[in-house]
Amino acid sequence: LKNVNVSRQSIYNFIKRNCMEKVGPGIYISKDVLEDEAYVLSQRCPKGVISHDDALYYYGLVDREPFVHCITIYSGYNPSALTNSGYKVYTVKKELLDLGKTTITNQFGHEIPMYDLERTICDLVRSRRNFEIQDFNMAIKTYLQRSDKDLNRLMVYAKSFRIEKIIRQYMEVLL
């Protein structure tokens, strides 16, 4: 707002006058509006991609809304501000960060970066020790029943993450 000559004091007065609440650095919402935590997270970390539990829930692979919102960022990024705020942060090599990245419109009407279905399955398998076995199995089975699944894309992603063998084993057992 400095570019259009709006002073800090004017901004603070506007926030106070409109009873807004700070939800992140430079991010304010009206107190009578339900907070879109995934959107706030994507604004706090614009280079990150909403992932794991959030993506599983968005795609209907699990039926429980996540308790903790998840984001994936490149290795070397300092996630302490995000983890201190209660977010779960996953890291990948920089060259893998955009693999499977897409933009979705969530239930609040906000566009947020999120991984596609196949990348979400790869993340699930890579982080399988962090998931309850029932949720893990339900997500894999639900994915395999979907008409919009792309097993070829899944295997391309699996190769990039070096988890082809593991993915094949799950597919053989569950198909």
Residue spans for each PLM region:
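Nucleic-acid-binding surface
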Residues: 15, 23, 27-175
